[in-house]
Design a protein with these regions (language model features):
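Long, low-complexity, intrinsically disordered segments
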Residues: 167-195
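Intrinsically disordered, low-complexity terminal tails and inter-domain linkers enriched
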Residues: 151-176
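Intrinsically disordered, low-complexity, compositionally biased regions/tails
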Residues: 58, 83, 152-154, 158-161, ...
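N-terminal intrinsically disordered, cationic/polar leader segments
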Residues: 1-90, 95-154
Length: 195
């Protein structure tokens, strides 16, 4: 396991209209706004797209199983934004459904909007994260923490430590109500002063 910690930065709400490729539109928007790391959630519909629905066989390196879909498909999904050598890289996963058929996987290459898609982009600042090529999987994977950080004298870097600093008692109680980082994000959003 690896981890890194950051802070919630800007939040953008984006409407993508009929005929626009969601992948192209969001990539351009993220580059234009200078978002280097964050997450995306989106809902709406697609008229066509291409997705990887798992590997052909569960072997290393994986051979992706591509599926094309066309027509009006409802969609909801999430994405992560992590920098690579060329700037912000977006990794999308989504579920699409139409008339009792559903697909779930990694959106790739094209995702053309039908009617509208609404997306919310959460910028995360202060992260130590990057995408790097992984020899075993032959994929660009997210690596968390700074290269070489904490590796001298056999110590694990901060991203590999098992113990976490104690939280004040009030935060411990709040954190137990919701899983993982979701509680922290919701808490941060609800505590922000009005603008």
């Amino acid at each position: 396991m690896q981890y890194t910690e950051g802070q919630l930065g800007r939040v953008f709400v984006v409407r993508i209209d009929d005929g626009e490729d969601m992948l192209v539109t969001l990539r351009q928007f993220i580059q234009d706004k200078g978002v280097q790391a964050g997450s995306i959630v989106f809902i709406g519909a697609l008229k066509e797209g291409r997705m990887v629905t798992g590997p052909e066989e569960p072997v290393y390196p994986p051979v992706p199983h591509f599926v094309m879909f066309e027509g009006g498909w409802e969609v909801f999904g999430v994405g992560t934004i992590v920098p690579d050598k060329d700037g912000p890289h977006i990794h999308y996963h989504a579920s699409v459904g139409r008339a009792g058929t559903a697909l779930t996987g990694c959106l790739r290459e094209t995702a053309v909007t039908y009617l509208v898609i609404e997306a919310v982009i959460y910028e995360i600042t202060g992260l130590s994260a990057r995408r790097e090529f992984d020899e075993k999987t032959q994929l660009e994977l997210t690596v968390l923490g700074n290269p070489g950080e904490g590796e001298k004298d056999g110590e694990a870097g901060p991203e590999e430590k098992e113990e976490h600093p104690a939280l004040p008692e009030e935060k411990k109680e709040e954190k137990s109500e919701l899983p993982g980082g979701l509680a922290d994000i919701i808490r941060d959003l609800t505590r922000r002063p009005p603008t």
